[in-house]
Amino acid sequence: ARALSRIADPAALELLKKSLADEDAEVVAWSAYGLGYGCKGNEAATVRALVGRAATLSVTKIDRSGPLDWGASFADALGRCGNAEAEATLRAWLDIDDKSEAAALALGRMASRRKRLDDASIVALLDAASRPDKPVASALLAFTRIDAGSDMIKARLFNVANDALSDSAGARRSFAVRALGRVGDAAVPALSKVLREPSFTVTERSDAARELARIGEAGQVELRKSLAAFVPKPETRATLKGAELAPLRVVLDSLALPIRDAKPALDEIASIELPKGDPAFARRLIGLRCRAASLLAGEGITQPKLVACDPDPEGVAGRLALLEVLARGKLTGTRFTRFKELVESKAPLVRQAALEQLGSHPEVAEPESILAKALRAPDAGTVATAAQVIASYPDRAAERRTRTTATEAVDGSTPAPEPIKPHASIVDALTTAFTLQRAPDSTEVWTALTDAAGALQILSFKPKLDAFCKSPNPALRQHAEKALRVMGEQKRECKAEGPAPRPSELDHLVSDKVTLVFETDSGEVKLSLDPALAPVAVTRFVDLARSGFFEKVRVHRVVPGFVVQLGDPGGDGYGGAGKAPLACETSPISFDPLSVGVALAGRDTGSSQLFVTLAAFPHLDGDYALIGRAEPGWERIAQGDVVQRVRVLPP
């Protein structure tokens, strides 16, 4: 049932319907999970099968011992199907003690996917979240993913979430903080309290800053007021070597112009003295200095603190801050000259960030020349970024770009846009990009190039897209199908014509749990990988750790309060170990705080990047392979930290 649930094709789904009747709880759980994963297009029949089997399980004695909760698997499957009957069933389960928590989680995931819930479900979730005897901890999850709606619902959500702030740290309190931003101005005092009080966790305080930013101007007023409390004094500055960096960084990132009364605090932060002999700590402080300087500068690219924030003239933090400032105005004249330097930078992170600005700056001269050069870049991330820009803004790659604002025809109607004629340099660069040999785990580059070819409707690339359409990789097939339909084959359906290559890891699968100890710039952190969850992926990461792959690799992504991610030698998130992509060994097990997962750029695209969640994020459940659990301490890690050494236990 586990294997069938991960295949989830029509033949597998028929077998899963049969195994749903099994008497083994684990088989039933995997069967329900697989049916939910393959529910699209067959929602009504699948929901009926799930609801019927759940009803019989409720009155029969089935052994519930084991690693999986069949009730949670059924709820998750119904949430994935997401039709009216599924939602009504989950709503009813909120009133059943042994199903309420799973039902709330499933409704939260449904809200994340659909961006809405029925009014009856919203009321039922608020009822469940506010039960005086035993509130359902996950009932507020849905409100972290959708807007609250009417003023009456907002008022009730505020009362429920505000009450939850008095709980001890846990899922209910965490979801309450994230839900308060949907309430609006009335939530500002409560969020301010969370942000300022050290009794709340670093994750909750970081979330509070983000939710204040979501609220708008009232939230910005509070962020500006709060900033002064976060300015590190010389005697307490060392706390920024650890987790206390996160709330300050999120406050800075959440602030928007104009800065008004935040200027004195920003001046202090932009002027923090850098330590000598501690480059890792200095890097953290440079990031703070440059973000503060960017806010102080507004549109002024010669602002003294902006110029001085990064002592390395080629430093990434300083150049990214300059790019932020440049992007606030038109990229013409001197500003364009500086932009051109950044968009041709040898630092991939800087170059990619500059390329992304082309979409919002139609005034940039000759964008097709910039994009063509980027498509020929030596690093995969820059190639993929350029292709993604073309896919989203195909006129930037055209011989003659269409006007950004349509003019009315004589009869008052809006004329259809002119067909885009790709610039010859773009066609040449894409041709080269498509013909290069790339590492087996370069799926993200291939899908980006496919999207670009489709957006520009370059018919000469159809043979390449036809090949992708038959690929065993589902991400390649999905993007190829979309591109081919844009090119005129509206009914094209892509199907694999052969199996994926056999993973080499199958020849030496890890059989027992393994602990990885990462020695980083921010200290030692640990995680435990469990092959029972995802045997092939766990074996891959253990092999990489033993080979020394992770040593000297930077932590390329940190979202405070959300995730820490590493495993790309290039440091921009586009690279891997050069091995065949991993099939998604997903499961019904939840991403709780300190869960370890395989990073993806689409189904079956994992390679060597892993992430650690810093709080509960159930919307990840079932879409990412969960491969283990981490020990506390990962909240200390900062973006840019280097893994100096990795130990594997047992050796």
Predicted segment positions?
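Short, intrinsically disordered, charge-balanced linker/junction segments flanking boundaries
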Residues: 1-3, 127-128, 628-629, 635-636
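Structural detector for internal amphipathic alpha-helices that build alpha-solenoid repeat scaffolds
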Residues: 1-9, 15-18, 28-41, 60-83, ...
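Amphipathic alpha-helical scaffolding segments comprising HEAT/armadillo-like alpha-solenoid repeats
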Residues: 9-21, 40-61, 83-95, 113-129, ...
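Single, functionally critical "micro-switch" positions that shape active/binding sites
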Residues: 23, 168, 346, 378, ...
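Alpha-helix N-cap/helix-start capping motif
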Residues: 25, 348, 380, 631-634
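Cyclophilin-like peptidyl-prolyl cis-trans isomerases
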Residues: 404, 410-428, 432-651
